């Protein structure tokens, strides 16, 4: 029986330890091709480069042939599918350094964005993210710190094999999985939490007296029994099925009534 084929990408870039931890876990039971951004691309969402050319380079990383794309995670995914002609059974994005939970985060996450684009192109996908105790390590040079991926690799192995063998659940071709930084208490199927940050903008002045700005976010916690945010805070692996259809169906009947008043 042929081994399943997986296209592996991320948003932290080709040098990320999380990417290669996922590769190490999945290459034991699948043929994995790595196509990842050349540099850090966090928080770019599902954006695509349509106004600039993209370059893809073949490299050897950790003794493995891989491909780097000078672009965004979605660019890497598309070049893997259409530039290299890959026909994967599954796309895996991650392991991201830092959780991707709540409505707020998944729409900006490059990790989830690449997985969404895979589903848009007809390929089921899983996005894996690891909670970080040290928030500064989310965007630090991956070569400047070490992260223990032992239990993350175990999660990746179990869930990737599960969905390869049994297929995706009805009504969802995209699974968002978040792994706690501490010892895992178990697994929970969750829904998206409301918010993760209280957004603010910080104004600063450069040496020439001109203003510039940083967008900040102070973490907040809204208790919701079945949310991914709550599960992760309690050290459970959060497993959230996502849908590509953003239609607010419950609003349609009332909206139909409202537009009757338009001349």
Curated annotation (Swiss-Prot):
Assigned GO CC terms: cytoplasm
Reaction equation(s) it catalyzes: a ribonucleoside 5'-phosphate + H2O = a ribonucleoside + phosphate
Class of enzymatic activity (EC top level): hydrolase
Key words of the record: Cytoplasm, Hydrolase, Metal-binding, Nucleotide-binding
Annotated cofactor note: Binds 1 divalent metal cation per subunit.
Localization annotation: Cytoplasm
Residue numbers binding a divalent metal cation: 11-12, 42, 96
EC number: 3.1.3.5
Domain of life: Archaea
Names of required cofactors: a divalent metal cation
Entry keyword annotation includes Disulfide bond: no
Any Pfam family: SurE
GO-annotated molecular function: 5'-nucleotidase activity; metal ion binding; nucleotide binding
Role description: Nucleotidase that shows phosphatase activity on nucleoside 5'-monophosphates.
Similarity field: Belongs to the SurE nucleotidase family.
Name of the protein: 5'-nucleotidase SurE
Species of origin: Methanocorpusculum labreanum (strain ATCC 43576 / DSM 4855 / Z)
């Amino acid at each position: 029986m042929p081994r399943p084929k997986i296209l592996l990408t991320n948003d932290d870039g080709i040098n990320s330890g999380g990417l290669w931890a996922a590769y190490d876990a999945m290459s034991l039971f699948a043929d994995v091709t790595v196509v990842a951004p050349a540099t850090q691309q966090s928080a770019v969402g599902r954006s695509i480069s349509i106004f600039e050319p993209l370059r893809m380079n073949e490299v050897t990383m950790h003794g493995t042939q891989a491909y780097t794309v000078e672009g965004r995670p979605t660019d890497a995914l598309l070049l893997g599918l259409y530039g290299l002609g890959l026909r994967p059974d599954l796309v895996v994005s991650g392991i991201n350094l830092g959780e991707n939970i709540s409505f707020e985060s998944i729409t900006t996450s490059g990790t989830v964005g690449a997985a969404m684009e895979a589903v848009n192109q007809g390929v089921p996908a899983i996005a894996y993210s690891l909670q970080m105790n040290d928030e500064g390590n989310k965007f630090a040079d991956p070569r400047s710190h070490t992260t223990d991926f032992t239990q993350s690799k175990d999660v990746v192995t179990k869930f990737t094999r599960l969905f390869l063998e049994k297929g995706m659940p009805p009504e969802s071709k995209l699974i968002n999985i978040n792994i706690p930084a501490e010892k895992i208490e178990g697994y929970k199927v969750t829904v998206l939490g409301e918010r993760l940050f209280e957004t603010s903008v910080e104004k600063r002045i450069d040496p020439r007296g001109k203003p510039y700005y940083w967008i900040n976010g102070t973490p907040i916690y809204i208790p919701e029994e079945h949310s991914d945010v709550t599960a992760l805070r309690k050290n459970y692996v959060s497993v959230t099925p996502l849908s590509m259809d953003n239609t607010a169906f419950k609003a349609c009947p009332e909206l139909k009534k409202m537009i009757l008043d338009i001349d």
